[in-house]
UniProtKB/Swiss-Prot annotation:
It comes from Homo sapiens (Human). Its main location: membrane. Intestinal brush border. Residues 342-504 form the MAM domain. SMART domains: CUB, LDLa, MAM, SEA, SR, Tryp_SPc. Residues 182-223, 641-679 form the LDL-receptor class A domain. Its EC number is 3.4.21.9. SUPFAM superfamilies: Concanavalin A-like lectins/glucanases, LDL receptor-like module, SEA domain, Spermadhesin, CUB domain, SRCR-like, Trypsin-like serine proteases. Residues 54-169 form the SEA domain. This is Enteropeptidase.
């Protein structure tokens, strides 16, 4: 019988060893799980820490005020100057941070760029972990203050300039060239090395600015016009054909043409037809130093020759027109040094301007024209070569025009003529207001002479001219046309050079077209005396045109004790050239109240006396409608009501209590209550004497009691002078009241009025003058050669170029950080809109207005000396205020003002400087000119200038034999005399008879007669 087998289910107990091993295994499992969790958390924390800035970069900046001078090489990161200065500054920054509280976090630094303005440094700081910008700035300032770097012996850093810029970058690993992504300042872009920023307009300009050259990458810079950028080789082409604008914004296509050194470039245009807003600019050179040589639009310019081996061509597309063929240009290289004189001169303008070039220092450019000019009453109807509308000629700018201007055309340098040669040409001078055409010969020795000149209207025909040339040194020929505003076109054609002297001309000498007599008499009659109720008057022929060359006078009268308010109901004069002048009284030396010109409206004018003189003075060019005016009389018209006896009247008419006068707080809106609170009394010069303080309305003399060196310095500063030089007690017999001075704990002065001084001793103080009249950049190593010559850069750091409407018109002198002294006749009629003036400080070359040494400033206030008399040329001085103060540099410094009693004796050699014409009515200088001239006595000057009244307000200088003088364009500039190693402003260039003629000195406003008036603006 089978049986069934079962499995036993009985229980087996564990041994103690088994239990122990099981427990250990469980513990190990728990530990492993814990370690894994901790590791994960650590990794996450590490990632979070990196995200929070475990590696950190900050961008900072500061300004170096001394120890190094800015130069343009600092813009080039590859230059030795950049590398040396960057190395020294990085060493300085490293030393500061490695001795700071951030030494453990700090890694290194990198200088990015230098900017002009003393020297502004931009640099990056690298840290191992995140640091706040406040902490970075604080540690940097503390390190600079504590001189924590050996480099601070050399460099002085402006602590107020230290700042952390907006850029703050953090990364999760150390900064290396392979992974840093740089952020650039506004207006700049990064190079492909991701380490360097350069200005955006430096890309694709023909000059390498990025260390890796990526800013001139041919692929990146390829134009949308034809896909090209850099054109090399002896010939090539570029084009912009059928160029509809591809976007809403303007499009710029730019090409760089580069041929072998020593060669020049000829541009030819197979096709050229663009919309008038789409302009092709042709520049000589590349980069920031390129010079605009031609701007072309609409019609084919023919051939353009650029005398450089590099050309920049820039096509600006503004329109969205699609029916213009654009242009197709080719270029070829040529060697201009192989040209002879005849090839350089001969030109009929059928092939562009041939080898003639536009004068960059004139006021406008010659135009190449086919057919008639703009106006039917001036200029040719056709060229001279073919005598029909198919040929070309050149003309001064056509159209109505807006100003008087010189238009110059220059030859290439010509070789000395071994035998005489005849320069011939055809000229066209037709128009009622045609001025002048001249031919000048100049050489490298700055010698210039006029060899041909014609003035006036010669009718609507081409006239023949010729000049024999016989020069012994290299020279240039210059055609200069002087154009008036309208009806004054001058044209040239068929210029040629032939062997031998010029023979008698086969063509008759042209005769002037008689000038029609003026339609109206220039004498207005009068002067007209006007009394109430006959108070309305107007210019002659109003509202029709007033006469040219008019001089009209109205004298307005009121009863004694009253004054006059003049109101212009209508006003329309030719701007600048025609003026209404208003004076306070009838006498010739009455004060100038206003000069009005241009279109109205104009402000009312108030006299301070019971008489007012109104003058209308016009020139000989244009006339407009004139003016209609009326006047009223009354008591205190336009004058604020006088204040009560216990109040002070501010300059703006406000009244403030006398107790608030000179209390250290401004109560007048114009600040005049704190303007005149301390002065010298009984001194020998304007920087010494007894000290007086105004307390309320009473002047108190300072006691010697408790006087200290610090008080001397504080008082000198209040007086607008330098530090205290010396002080000593004196024992006068003068009565009080007196004032005792003490220094408060916070440094301000405490004034205590007193009826008596201790031991009756007063203080006599002498202050140092503020630093002025010092040359820092260009010291004279040898005595200057007497005669006009190019000045060194920085030789006259106070000489300022004054530009009006973009044209250098006058000079000026810097006398403080925000005030200039110039001539009144420069700004007369140009004073109503000061912002049209721009002062260029630190200027050396007119062709380089963007030099790092130059600083432009708009003018925001013009004050003509109220005693200025234009007709007598007396008191010819004016003040001009800069919109913003200027920082002094090696190239910008103030000149010293003379004492009121300072004498510059006759016979002393002083200096003049300016950019004016180098010959009378010739071309202006590009580089600042300087010369020495001897001073003359006023008696001698009066003998040599008998047609003028030489007053005590004038000083004269010049050689009896002539040859050296100020000239047109130098007006307003300085006459400078040196004393005790400082330069003083002795005179302001005013007037003369022509320029540099024998026994015809230059006349200058004598500045010592105006020192007090000038200083009233400075303090």
């Amino acid at each position: 019988m089978g049986s069934k087998r079962g499995i036993s289910s009985r229980h087996h107990s564990l041994s103690s060893y088994e239990i122990m091993f099981a427990a250990l295994f469980a513990i190990l499992v728990v530990l492993c799980a814990g370690l894994i969790a901790v590791s994960c958390l650590t990794i996450k924390e590490s990632q979070r820490g990196a995200a929070l800035g475990q590696s950190h970069e900050a961008r900072a900046t500061f300004k170096i005020t001394s120890g190094v001078t800015y130069n343009p090489n600092l813009q080039d990161k590859l230059s030795v100057d950049f590398k040396v200065l960057a190395f020294d500054l990085q060493q300085m920054i490293d030393e500061i941070f490695l001795s700071s509280n951030l030494k453990n976090e700090y890694k290194n630094s990198r200088v990015l760029q230098f900017e002009n303005g003393s020297i502004i440094v931009v640099f990056d700081l690298f840290f191992a972990q995140w640091v706040s910008d406040e902490n970075v700035k604080e540690e940097l300032i503390q390190g600079l203050e504590a001189n924590k770097s050996s480099q601070l012996v050399t460099f002085h850093i402006d602590l107020n300039s230290v700042d952390i810029l907006d850029k703050l970058t953090t990364t999760s690993h150390l900064a290396t060239p392979g992974n840093v992504s740089i952020e650039c300042l506004p207006g700049s872009s990064p190079c492909t090395d991701a380490l360097t920023c350069i200005k955006a307009d430096l890309f694709c300009d023909g000059e390498v600015n990025c260390p890796d050259g990526s800013d001139e990458d041919n692929k990146m810079c390829a134009t949308v016009c034809d896909g090209r950028f850099l054109l090399t080789g002896s010939s090539g082409s570029f084009q912009a054909t059928h160029y509809p604008k591809p976007s809403e914004t303007s499009v710029v296509c730019q090409w760089i043409i580069r041929v072998n050194q020593g060669l020049s470039i000829k541009l030819s245009f197979d096709d050229f037809n663009t919309y008038y807003t789409d302009i092709l600019d042709i520049y000589e050179g590349v980069g920031s130093s390129k010079i605009l040589r031609a701007s072309i639009w609409e019609t084919n310019p023919g051939t353009i020759r650029i005398f450089s081996n590099q050309v920049t061509a820039t096509f600006l597309i503004e329109s969205d027109e699609s029916d213009y063929v654009g242009f197709n240009a080719t270029y070829t290289a040529f060697n201009s040094s192989e040209l002879n004189n005849y090839e350089k001169i001969n030109c009929n303008f059928e092939d562009g301007f041939c080898f003639w070039v536009q004068d960059l220092n004139d006021d406008n450019e010659w135009e190449r024209i086919q057919g008639s000019t703009f106006s039917p009453f001036t200029g040719p109807n056709f060229d001279h070569t073919f005598g029909n509308a198919s040929g070309f000629y050149i003309s001064t700018p056509t159209g109505p025009g807006g100003r008087q201007e010189r238009v110059g055309l220059l030859s290439l340098p010509l070789d000395p003529t071994l035998e005489p040669a005849c320069l011939s040409f055809w000229y066209h001078m037709y128009g009622e207001n045609v001025h002048k055409l001249s031919i000048n010969i100049s050489n490298d020795q700055n010698m210039e002479k006029t060899v041909f000149q014609k003035e006036g209207n010669y009718g609507d025909n081409w006239n023949y001219g010729q000049v024999t040339l016989n020069e012994t040194v290299k020279f240039k020929v210059a055609f200069n046309a002087f154009k008036n505003k309208i009806l004054s076109d001058i044209a040239l054609d068929d210029i040629s050079l032939t062997y031998g002297i010029c023979n008698g001309s086969l063509y008759p000498e042209p005769t002037l077209v008689p000038t029609p007599p003026p339609e109206l008499p220039t004498d207005c009659g009068g002067p007209f005396e006007l009394w109430e109720p006959n108070t309305t008057f107007s210019s002659t022929n109003f509202p029709n045109s007033y006469p040219n060359l008019a001089f009209c006078v109205w004298i307005l009268n009121a009863q004694k004790g009253k004054n006059i308010q003049l109101h212009f109901q209508e006003f329309d004069l030719e701007n600048i050239n025609d003026v209404v002048e208003i004076r306070d009284g009838e006498e010739a030396d009455s004060l100038l109240l206003a000069v009005y010109t241009g279109p109205g409206p104009v402000k009312d004018v108030f006299s301070t006396t019971n008489r007012m003189t109104v003058l209308l003075i016009t020139n000989d060019v244009l006339a407009r409608g004139g003016f209609k005016a009326n006047f009223t009389t009354g008591y205190h018209l336009g004058i604020p009501e006088p204040c009560k006896a216990d109040h002070f009247q501010c300059k703006n008419g406000e009244c403030v209590p006398l107790v608030n006068l000179c209390d250290g707080h401004l109560h007048c809106e114009d600040g005049s209550d704190e303007a005149d609170c301390v002065r010298f009394f009984n001194g020998t010069t304007n920087n010494n004497g007894l000290v007086r303080f105004r307390i309320q309305s009473i002047w108190h003399t300072a006691c010697a009691e408790n006087w200290t060196t610090q008080i001397s310095n504080d008082v000198c500063q209040l007086l607008g002078l330098g530090s205290g030089n010396s002080s000593k007690p004196i024992f006068p017999t003068d009565g009080g009241p007196f004032v005792k001075l003490n220094t408060a704990p916070d440094g301000h002065l405490i004034l205590t009025p007193s009826q008596q001084c201790l031991q009756d001793s007063l203080i006599r103080l002498q202050c140092n003058h503020k630093s002025c009249g010092k040359k820092l950049a260009a010291q004279d190593i040898t005595p200057k050669i007497v005669g006009g010559s190019n000045a060194k850069e920085g030789a006259w750091p106070w000489v300022v170029g004054l530009y009006y409407g973009g044209r250098l018109l006058c000079g000026a002198s810097l006398v403080s950080s925000d005030w200039l002294v110039s001539a009144a006749h420069c700004v007369y009629g140009r004073n109503l809109e000061p912002s049209k003036w721009t002062a260029i400080l630190g200027l050396h070359m007119k062709s380089n207005l963007t030099s790092p040494q130059t600083v432009p400033r708009l003018i925001d206030e013009i004050v003509i000396n109220p005693h200025y008399n234009r007709r007598r040329k007396d008191n010819d001085i004016a003040m001009m205020h800069l919109e913003f103060k200027v920082n002094y540099t090696d190239y910008i410094q103030p000149i010293c003002l003379p004492e009121e009693n300072q004498v510059f004796p006759p016979g002393r050699n002083c200096s003049i400087a300016g950019w004016g014409t180098v010959v009378y009515q010739g071309t202006t200088a590009n580089i600042l000119q300087e010369a020495d001239v001897p001073l003359l006595s006023n008696e001698r000057c009066q003998q040599q200038m008998p047609e003028y009244n030489i007053t005590e307000n004038m000083i004269c200088a010049g050689y009896e034999e002539g040859g050296i003088d100020s000239c047109q364009g130098d007006s307003g500039g300085p006459l400078m005399c040196q004393e005790n190693n400082r330069w003083f402003l002795a005179g302001v260039t005013s007037f003369g008879y022509k320029c540099a003629l024998p026994n015809r000195p230059g006349v200058y406003a004598r500045v010592s007669r105006f020192t007090e008036w000038i200083q009233s603006f400075l303090h």
